[in-house]
Regions:
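Bacterial N-terminal signal peptides that target proteins for export
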Residues: 1-9
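Solvent-exposed helix-loop boundary motif
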Residues: 19-114, 132-159, 168-231, 260-261, ...
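Periplasmic/extracellular electron-transfer cofactor-ligation site
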Residues: 37-60, 119, 123-132, 386-402, ...
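Hydrophobic h-region of N-terminal signal peptides that target proteins for export
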Residues: 11-20
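Catalytic cores of secreted or luminal carbohydrate-active enzymes
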Residues: 107-127, 636-639
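Primarily short, surface-exposed interaction patches in extracytoplasmic proteins
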Residues: 226-300, 305-595, 615-616, 620-629
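Helix-loop elements that line ligand-binding/catalytic pockets
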Residues: 600-603, 623, 627-636
């Protein structure tokens, strides 16, 4: 049976005898929606699921307050509210379990949340004014949490500034989550350090996000920083953080270990026994930097990086046909061999047109074909941003909205493909009929718009798609685009160090911050200052002491896995492993459809040697542009 009027509220409203004008107005936007989010009603496991829960649906994590308000107001013919007797409203009875509720108890009768919703119903379930009640800024205190030992705790305070200038402490309603719970465990707004390491707290409130870094250092006494040689700015920035965290870096690896490591990383091949003996016997103080130059200039370097870019760009005859895949591979290979500036390489793909055989860069569009997957691929590969979550709803962990998803996709909406004159040839053009990008919710036409401000030579969003693509290409590769250079150096860094400064490398977002922001900024600036030169970037990383560190750990860095204080053991890729076995045994593998003496790294397509050794050890099928498609775990897949 429902209670008609709890004593607490009776005293609040009857004894106070407040008039409607004296009672502060409670609105859905400012007061009620945060409660639904905090209590989990809009979570993916509850009513925020794609199809809702038990016949009732809300937007995921409350990204669409208008939809949620209308669902509450009009679903069940408005039977969720009883204005004559608010306490008998289903919206209060279910979460307090006065009637059966699959979600269990969400809050108690008489609690602060109960009182807010009660007042909202009594005042007429007002939506509120977005021009006044929307959150404009979220602030978190402290700015950083630094704990001297596991077991220490800290309290997080969250305040919101609304569109009308009003401010409120929203600590109780804000959602605070840790990206590494076994380092920083969160209970409501309290965080406790549980082990040595680093974590980031993501604070969410009404579509706004803030992050808070948490560091728990080693409490062990006796630490004394021992300076090691610093080859360049990479070492200075890495050491600055390590010293602060009481982590002593490992010394450099020996010559044989360095030769093996850099040979695999730059050309994907092990050194021969003769090369090992010669390098170890060499007494030159500059032999390591000279070796890097030699490897970068080798044909094997071109093969190795052609393979990597072929994976990312999904070069496969499944999508492109045999000739298309060959032509695209040769274009990638020529770009690597010429050391084409990376921004030029990307612009050539984005601005390609005409025959997929005459302009092989046009094959980039033949993989995804449609505007939405094309946009998703360009942002993930070239910016490290995953927009796919925003196709159906606002991104739950980032600022990207569903509107922005379709505005970005509109840059490619008129791109079309038609058959060419040769077998398998397609012509890329920019005048597809009915090319308007429409929002799935209401059908309105979405005009192209950048997700972030950056430079390009035009003004506004061009009306013709050829110009749209030009605008997009210039914006994406602009020197002041905050993601382009950073995502590139971060990806390349991961190839050499085993993990990115931001990891995963293609998931850059506020809730996945860099482990060393100063290092990432410096690498990006250096890359831009040297005109997006990939070889220069690799040379800079390879010559650093950080890259050349030993895998052997000490008592101060044995638990470090994020700050590059020592090298991380890495498994050889499928192609590297096969070529290594060929070198060790003297038995050259034979690939169907490939010339004799073809190495595994020279195989042009994932369909060559399909379901054999390479696939067993993790070769990607090039079905996705995600780095995660290549398996590098130690367990073999069962067949």
């Amino acid at each position: 049976m429902l209670r008609s009027e709890p004593p607490v509220l009776f005293l609040l409203f009857a004894a106070g005898a407040l008039s409607a004008t004296e009672t502060p107005k409670v609105t859905f936007l400012r007061d009620v929606a945060p409660i639904l989010n905090k209590t989990g009603c809009t979570a993916g496991a509850c009513h925020g699921a794609a199809k809702g829960k038990n016949g009732f649906k809300l937007s995921l994590r409350g990204y669409d307050p208008q939809f949620d308000y209308e669902a509450l107001l009009y679903d069940l013919s408005s039977r969720r509210f009883n204005r004559a007797d608010p306490a008998r409203s289903l919206m209060l009875a279910k979460p307090t379990q006065q009637v059966p509720h699959g979600g269990g108890l969400r809050f108690e009768i008489g609690s602060g949340y109960y009182k807010t919703i009660y007042t909202w119903i009594a005042q007429g379930v007002l939506f509120g004014d977005p021009a006044k009640d929307s959150v404009r800024r979220l602030e978190v205190e402290p700015r950083e949490i630094f704990m001297n030992a596991p077991g220490e705790s800290a309290v997080v305070k969250v305040s919101a500034t609304f569109a009308d200038g009003g401010q409120r402490d929203v600590t109780r309603e804000a959602v605070v989550e840790s990206n590494v719970p076994d380092v920083a465990a969160v209970t409501d707004a309290s965080v406790k350090g549980t082990r040595i390491g680093e974590a980031t707290l993501l604070v969410r409130y009404q579509g706004n996000f803030a992050t808070l870094p948490v560091t728990v250092i080693n409490p062990k006494s006796g630490f004394a920083w021992k300076s090691l040689p610093q080859a360049n700015y990479i070492d200075r920035l890495v050491d600055a953080k390590l010293q602060r965290l009481k982590i002593q870096p490992s010394p450099t690896v020996d010559d044989a270990g360095f030769l093996r490591r850099v040979s695999l990383d730059l050309k994907g091949q092990l050194p021969t026994p003769d090369e090992v003996r010669a390098f170890v016997a060499n007494t030159s103080r500059t032999k390591r930097s000279e070796l890097i130059e030699k490897l970068i200039a080798s044909p094997a370097y071109v093969d190795h990086w052609t393979l990597k870019w072929g994976d990312l760009l999904q070069n496969s005859r499944k999508y492109l046909g045999e000739k298309g895949a060959f032509e695209f591979r040769e274009w990638i290979r020529d770009s690597i061999a010429q050391n084409k500036p990376y921004d030029h390489m990307v612009r050539e793909m984005l601005m390609a047109k005409g025959s997929s055989y005459d302009d092989p860069a046009a094959n980039f569009y033949r993989v995804t074909r449609d505007p939405k997957p094309t946009m998703e691929k360009t942002t993930q590969v070239f910016l490290g941003v995953r927009m796919v979550c925003a196709q159906c709803h606002d991104h739950p962990f980032e600022r990207w909205t569903q509107n922005q998803y379709y505005e970005m996709a509109a840059f490619f909406s008129a791109v079309g493909l038609r058959p060419g004159y040769e077998v398998g040839e397609e012509i890329l053009f920019d005048q597809r009929r009915d090319f308007d990008m429409k929002h799935p919710k209401d059908g309105r036409v979405m005009n192209p718009k950048f997700i972030l401000p950056a430079s390009w030579s035009g003004t506004g969003a061009p009306p013709i798609d050829a110009q749209r693509r030009q605008a997009y290409a210039e914006w994406l590769t602009a020197r002041d685009n905050p993601f382009f250079a950073k995502s590139t150096v971060n990806r390349v860094w991961s190839y050499f160090l085993g993990r990115g400064i931001i990891d995963p490398v293609d998931d850059i977002r506020a809730s996945n911050p860099p482990s060393n922001p100063a290092l990432l900024d410096a690498l990006a600036k250096d890359f831009i200052d040297h005109n997006f030169d990939l070889r220069y970037l690799m040379r800079t990383i390879g010559n650093s002491r950080t890259y050349q560190a030993s895998v052997v750990v000490n008592e101060w860095n044995e638990k470090d896995g994020e700050n590059f204080s020592h090298a991380m053991p890495r498994r050889l890729s499928a192609e590297e492993l096969m070529d290594a076995l060929a070198l060790a045994t003297g038995v050259q593998p034979v690939f169907p459809e490939a010339p004799p003496d073809t190495g595994a790294e020279q195989v042009t397509d994932p369909h060559v040697g399909k379901d054999g050794f390479l696939d067993l050890f993790g070769r990607p099928a090039r079905e996705s542009s995600c780095e995660c498609e290549r398996r590098s775990d130690l367990a073999c897949r069962r067949r």
